[in-house]
């Protein structure tokens, strides 16, 4: 068992995961500083190292080997159905609902498999993360080329309208949307969502608890700073690292037999409960019981500080993710409302075709971006980001938030495309 943990901690690309077992305090999950995988403490839980999820196989190369999955078929077959349905080859409302559900489910399965390979199977090395980011960048560039061709068509006909449409743009007799109203609201929604999502990612990568300078946050930050200084001091004066020292202490206390381990678990839970009481009395001194003795074990205080910090930080980030999702859903609703009550249709000449093609293609990208943001939100809820050190925003290939970063890139791409759409179609095209 000891050799297993020595091998486990020697691999810097590994991150210890939460197994959902509350086993008390006094457990060192890893060095919070100078490691790639940070400090893996899950919200309201302490990590039990003996139950760490082990990878299914050892990866002896840095390259990306994917496992078999039905996700690509679940995504591409609905796209083929949408094309056939558009041209009238297949016409079925039930089939459309099934295809849309399959598309969303396929993207979800795909995302889950990527998360599994990254966190649970530990297959995402530096090269793999770089490949994922570069793949997202190439995908965004290809989508830019798509929109470039559509905008080219729009400018080709609008800058030199022919006699078939009355030599004017928009075509004579066609009622078009004003750049005020719903288009302006959609612009505000997308820009606001991009700013909120960026702020959430900044909080995650810069390890901020919250922006507001209230007394509780300041107290937590001061205590956290003192704890970090203590770690640094202990590491500098001891031959063993703080992690090794704490791990050895844990095994000395808890690796004797099952009965002693259960006793240690109960004691740890009791210490945490006592700490909760101590925090309560700190905020309500008038209720302090006489001769009350607060816990002084560093591991208990360590656990409490980490838990408070992660709870505050992740709560703020999840709130921003919720707001981003709300903005995206409202945008899609407004777009659908605009389509339903549009004074023209796709069959009303070149203007209607280009309008619905450009805005509809963008709306599809908003839907995909909403799914990606929803997946990141679910990952926050289940505790995938309950790490202190996820890396900075300038360490995309090394940090533990590569998926969040790629989602942020994609959402900014959606924002920028909409700004061009708003200026070209709604503002310039309606003048």
Curated annotation (Swiss-Prot):
<dbReference type="InterPro" id="IPR035973">
    <property type="entry name" value="Cyt_c_oxidase_su3-like_sf"/>
</dbReference>
<feature type="transmembrane region" description="Helical">
    <location>
        <begin position="356"/>
        <end position="376"/>
    </location>
</feature>
<dbReference type="GO" id="GO:0004129">
    <property type="term" value="F:cytochrome-c oxidase activity"/>
</dbReference>
<dbReference type="Pfam" id="PF00510">
    <property type="entry name" value="COX3"/>
</dbReference>
<dbReference type="GO" id="GO:0005743">
    <property type="term" value="C:mitochondrial inner membrane"/>
</dbReference>
<feature type="transmembrane region" description="Helical">
    <location>
        <begin position="321"/>
        <end position="341"/>
    </location>
</feature>
<keyword id="KW-0472">Membrane</keyword>
<keyword id="KW-1133">Transmembrane helix</keyword>
<feature type="transmembrane region" description="Helical">
    <location>
        <begin position="70"/>
        <end position="90"/>
    </location>
</feature>
<comment type="function">
    <text>Component of the cytochrome c oxidase, the last enzyme in the mitochondrial electron transport chain which drives oxidative phosphorylation. The respiratory chain contains 3 multisubunit complexes succinate dehydrogenase (complex II, CII), ubiquinol-cytochrome c oxidoreductase (cytochrome b-c1 complex, complex III, CIII) and cytochrome c oxidase (complex IV, CIV), that cooperate to transfer electrons derived from NADH and succinate to molecular oxygen, creating an electrochemical gradient over the inner membrane that drives transmembrane transport and the ATP synthase.</text>
</comment>
<keyword id="KW-0812">Transmembrane</keyword>
<keyword id="KW-0999">Mitochondrion inner membrane</keyword>
<comment type="subunit">
    <text>Component of the cytochrome c oxidase (complex IV, CIV), a multisubunit enzyme composed of a catalytic core of 3 subunits and several supernumerary subunits. The complex exists as a monomer or a dimer and forms supercomplexes (SCs) in the inner mitochondrial membrane with ubiquinol-cytochrome c oxidoreductase (cytochrome b-c1 complex, complex III, CIII).</text>
</comment>
<keyword id="KW-1278">Translocase</keyword>
<keyword id="KW-0496">Mitochondrion</keyword>
<dbReference type="InterPro" id="IPR013833">
    <property type="entry name" value="Cyt_c_oxidase_su3_a-hlx"/>
</dbReference>
<protein>
    <recommendedName>
        <fullName>Cytochrome c oxidase subunit 3</fullName>
        <ecNumber>7.1.1.9</ecNumber>
    </recommendedName>
</protein>
<feature type="transmembrane region" description="Helical">
    <location>
        <begin position="132"/>
        <end position="152"/>
    </location>
</feature>
<dbReference type="InterPro" id="IPR000298">
    <property type="entry name" value="Cyt_c_oxidase-like_su3"/>
</dbReference>
<feature type="transmembrane region" description="Helical">
    <location>
        <begin position="408"/>
        <end position="428"/>
    </location>
</feature>
<feature type="transmembrane region" description="Helical">
    <location>
        <begin position="96"/>
        <end position="116"/>
    </location>
</feature>
<dbReference type="InterPro" id="IPR033945">
    <property type="entry name" value="Cyt_c_oxase_su3_dom"/>
</dbReference>
<feature type="transmembrane region" description="Helical">
    <location>
        <begin position="176"/>
        <end position="196"/>
    </location>
</feature>
<comment type="similarity">
    <text>Belongs to the cytochrome c oxidase subunit 3 family.</text>
</comment>
<dbReference type="GO" id="GO:0006123">
    <property type="term" value="P:mitochondrial electron transport, cytochrome c to oxygen"/>
</dbReference>
<dbReference type="InterPro" id="IPR024791">
    <property type="entry name" value="Cyt_c/ubiquinol_Oxase_su3"/>
</dbReference>
């Amino acid at each position: 068992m000891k050799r297993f943990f020595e091998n486990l901690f020697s691999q810097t690309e590994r991150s210890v995961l939460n197994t959902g077992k509350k086993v008390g305090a006094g457990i060192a999950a890893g060095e919070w500083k100078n490691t790639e995988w940070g400090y893996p403490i899950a919200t309201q839980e302490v990590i039990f190292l003996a139950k760490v999820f082990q990878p299914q196989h050892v990866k002896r190369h840095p390259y990306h080997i994917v496992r078999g999955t039905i996700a690509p078929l679940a995504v591409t077959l609905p796209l083929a159905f949408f094309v056939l349905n558009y041209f009238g080859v297949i016409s079925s409302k039930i089939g459309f609902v099934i295809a849309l559900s399959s598309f969303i489910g396929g993207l979800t399965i795909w995302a889950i498999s990527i998360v599994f390979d990254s966190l649970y199977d530990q297959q995402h090395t530096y090269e793999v993360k770089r490949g994922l980011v570069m793949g997202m960048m190439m995908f965004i560039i290809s989508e830019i080329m798509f929109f470039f061709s559509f905008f080219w068509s729009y400018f080709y006909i609008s800058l030199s309208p022919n006699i078939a449409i009355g030599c004017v743009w928009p075509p004579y007799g066609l009622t078009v949307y004003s750049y005020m109203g719903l288009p302006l609201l959609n612009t505000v929604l997308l820009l606001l969502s991009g700013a909120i999502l960026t702020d959430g990612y900044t909080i995650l990568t810069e390890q901020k608890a919250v922006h507001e300078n209230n007394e509780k946050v300041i107290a937590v930050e001061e205590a956290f700073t003192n704890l970090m200084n203590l770690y640094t001091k202990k590491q500098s004066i001891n031959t063993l690292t703080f992690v090794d020292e704490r791990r050895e202490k844990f095994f000395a206390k808890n690796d004797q037999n099952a009965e002693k381990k259960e006793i240690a678990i109960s004691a740890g839970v009791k210490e945490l409960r006592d700490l909760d009481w101590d925090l309560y009395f700190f905020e309500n001194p008038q209720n302090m019981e006489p001769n009350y003795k607060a816990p002084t074990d560093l591991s208990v205080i360590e656990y409490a500080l980490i838990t408070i910090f992660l709870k505050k930080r992740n709560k703020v980030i999840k709130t921003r993710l919720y707001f981003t999702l709300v903005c995206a859903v409202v945008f899609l609703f407004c777009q659908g409302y605009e389509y339903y009550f549009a004074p023209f249709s796709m069959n009303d000449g070149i203007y209607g075709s280009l309008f619905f093609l450009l805005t509809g293609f963008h709306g599809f990208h908003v839907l995909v971006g909403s799914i990606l943001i929803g997946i990141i939100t679910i990952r926050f809820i289940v505790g995938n980001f309950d790490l202190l050190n996820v890396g900075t925003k300038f360490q995309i290939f090394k940090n533990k938030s590569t998926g969040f970063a790629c989602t942020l890139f994609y959402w900014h791409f959606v924002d920028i495309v909409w700004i061009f759409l708003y200026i070209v179609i709604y503002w310039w095209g309606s003048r």
